[in-house]
Amino acid sequence: MRFQPLFWVFFIFAMSLLFISEQKPVNFPRRRKLYRHNCFRRRCIPLHSRVPFP
């Protein structure tokens, strides 16, 4: 019967590790949204265009 308390200690320890690892830091840099042509700018067609006019 010594196995059950040891199991509960391990289970609570594993759940606390999962809970701590899921939290993100406050100053975590968010991924910027990519628009067309994998560009960060919303209207980037003139930048990637092969013609001299937009």
Curated annotation (Swiss-Prot):
The disulfide bridges present are none
Q: Which factors induce or repress this protein, as stated in its UniProt record?
A: Up-regulated following myocardial infarction (MI) (at protein level).
Gene inactivation phenotype reads:
Mice lacking APELA are not represented at the expected Mendelian ratios. Mutant embryos exhibit around 10% to 50% incidence of incomplete penetrance of embryonic lethality. Fetal death is increased especially in mothers devoid of all Apela expression. Mutant embryos show extraembryonic tissues anomalies, such as ectopic anterior chorion, mesoderm yolk sac and blood island protrusions and reduced allantois thickness at 8.25 dpc.
Nucleotidyltransferase as a keyword of this entry, yes or no, is no
Q: Which GO terms describe its molecular function?
A: apelin receptor binding; hormone activity
| Swiss-Prot/TrEMBL keywords | Angiogenesis, Developmental protein, Differentiation, Gastrulation, Hormone, Secreted, Signal
Q: What is one GO biological process annotated to this record?
A: G protein-coupled receptor signaling pathway
Which coarse location class applies to the principal site listed for this UniProt protein?
secreted
Q: How does it assemble?
A: Interacts with APLNR.
Name of this protein: Apelin receptor early endogenous ligand
Source organism of this protein record: Mus musculus
Gene giving rise to this polypeptide: Apela
